[in-house]
Amino acid sequence: MMNPLIIKLGGVLLDSEEALERLFSTLVNYRESHQRPLVIVHGGGCVVDELMKGLNLPVKKKNGLRVTPADQIDIITGALAGTANKTLLAWAKKHQIAAVGLFLGDGDSVKVTQLDEELGHVGLAQPGSPKLINSLLENGYLPVVSSIGVTDEGQLMNVNADQAATALAATLGADLILLSDVSGILDGKGQRIAEMTAAKAEQLIEQGIITDGMIVKVNAALDAARTLGRPVDIASWRHAEQLPALFNGMPMGTRILA
């Protein structure tokens, strides 16, 4: 089996039918013309935000990570492992793709521990066992994995989806693409940066050009590149025509180098 490719979906993609249609049409064509097994990892911050708003619950973030109190973890689990995950499975079904919905704890694929007590039910993701997902890939399934995990003590944890995708890529020896709303990392003039090293990232963070959630994304990508010993791409899902080339290793967004 070729080494798998993990496609991490994020941003408002889950809210856009047009974007999902484009993405899944591309996935169908790619799976027909390439032998490479694919895995989708997703968060769903916008789904969670809408739900929290509807329930009048405050959304708190610390250093770009969502604070998850004990009384909110069930709601967030429902949004990510439930609504967001099953929405993606429904799109797969619509496109005749045999998909399986999972969370990080299934088959112990990604190990999760509590990251920081102040963040509440927020998990740190580490590589786990590749057995379950490899067996699904060998049988032609598309695993769709939500970024909810569980600790050895049985506590549900909300994991940053970029970090969850990194841990799963390390588990499977997979390549990783982080798809988001932006076409990559932009410089101070709004131009896409083709390649990014840790030193360059630090410089742009210091200058205030990379901020908030993008800091988490860049750090996750740098961490992934270091952990995996290979470049990681941050790119946009908006240009569906570029996705097949991206999936085949052509740099289309910002390539993060270890």
Curated annotation (Swiss-Prot):
Leading EC class: transferase
Places the protein is found: Cytoplasm
Xref: Pfam families: AA_kinase
Binding site for ATP: 181-186, 209-211
Pathway participation: Amino-acid biosynthesis; L-arginine biosynthesis; N(2)-acetyl-L-ornithine from L-glutamate: step 2/4
Residues under site feature: Transition state stabilizer: 8, 217
Gene Ontology BP, a term: L-arginine biosynthetic process
GO CC terms, sorted: cytoplasm
Catalytic activity: N-acetyl-L-glutamate + ATP = N-acetyl-L-glutamyl 5-phosphate + ADP
SUPFAM superfamilies referenced in this protein's UniProt entry, alphabetically: Carbamate kinase-like (SSF53633)
Keywords for this protein: Amino-acid biosynthesis, Arginine biosynthesis, ATP-binding, Cytoplasm, Kinase, Nucleotide-binding, Transferase
CDD domains linked to this entry: AAK_NAGK-NC
Function according to Swiss-Prot or TrEMBL: Catalyzes the ATP-dependent phosphorylation of N-acetyl-L-glutamate.
Subunit structure: Homodimer.
Protein name according to UniProt: Acetylglutamate kinase
Gene name tied to this protein: argB
